[in-house]
Amino acid sequence: KKYSMMLDTLLKDAKKQLVSALIHKKHSFRYFTLTTLSLEGGPHSRTVVLRGFDPEKFTFSIYTDSRSDKVKELNKDDRAEFLFYDNNQLLQLLVRVNLIGSISSEEKFNSLSDSYKKDYCATQQPGNPIKGPEDIEYDFDKGYFIELNFKAVQIEYLKLKRPNHLRAKFHINQNWKGCFITP
């Protein structure tokens, strides 16, 4: 009973941290590592920005250019991992997710400031070679903005502390009932 309550507290803390990352732009979980399976078959990691999180449904959203590698990779294999780390709290969340949908929302795109719209309006595809940073051309009429939506299937919570690190795993198939695992 004691450990079950402790596990519930850890899961609630994970949700609280993710919600805080949406509210507070300086929260460490705002930027996180997204890892997909590359088209060649190996891991492909990059930093992305958390744009949405629903603590009841365990769904997440990010924005990207629809021509990016991550979109191609997720279309081939919808599994991915998110790695969140807070250096001050010594807290890590490793979240296994599946892509559940993508939305090309003109409304969300138009709500962005021009400086943010640039991230989705380059005429060159992401990853293509250019001479220099000034050689990027933009076409604001032709945005490639897309919102990717994910559903969590597993969460690992790791808190580095003394005398004992805390590590727990929660899985959708167990109705998010967690278990402690060796750190």
What annotation goes with each model-predicted range?
Residues 5-57:
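An N-terminal domain-cap segment
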